[in-house]
Amino acid sequence: MRKGIHPDYQEVVFMDSATGAKFVAGSTLKPEETIEFEGKTYPLVRVEISSDSHPFYTGKQKFAQADGRIEKFNKKYGMSSKN
């Protein structure tokens, strides 16, 4: 690898703004803010959503009921499924 062309890779703390959950991961981001986490000082990156608050990972995901929507459409526009 050529020297001087790659960004500095460092460990940073990502904090979920919605839940306050924190986790350490490697990143090339250079945030100004720092935080004390598990006895060490890390740069802090605040994120709006993470696996701790995303509905897909928390199991609170809503699924659209396609059958009900189709029936509602047919009822609204006078179409019947019995042709």
Swiss-Prot record:
Q: Which GO terms describe its molecular function?
A: structural constituent of ribosome
State one Pfam family annotation. Answer: Ribosomal_L31
Q: Which UniProt keywords apply?
A: Ribonucleoprotein, Ribosomal protein
| Gene3D superfamilies per record | Ribosomal protein L31 (4.10.830.30)
Gene Ontology terms: cellular component: ribonucleoprotein complex; ribosome
Single biological process term from Gene Ontology: translation
Domain of life (superkingdom): Bacteria
SUPFAM superfamilies linked to this entry: L28p-like
Question: What is stated as this protein's family in its record?
Answer: Belongs to the bacterial ribosomal protein bL31 family. Type B subfamily.
User: How does the record describe its quaternary structure?
Assistant: Part of the 50S ribosomal subunit.
NCBIfam families registered for this protein in UniProt: L31, PRK01678.1
Task: Write the protein's name.
Answer: Large ribosomal subunit protein bL31B
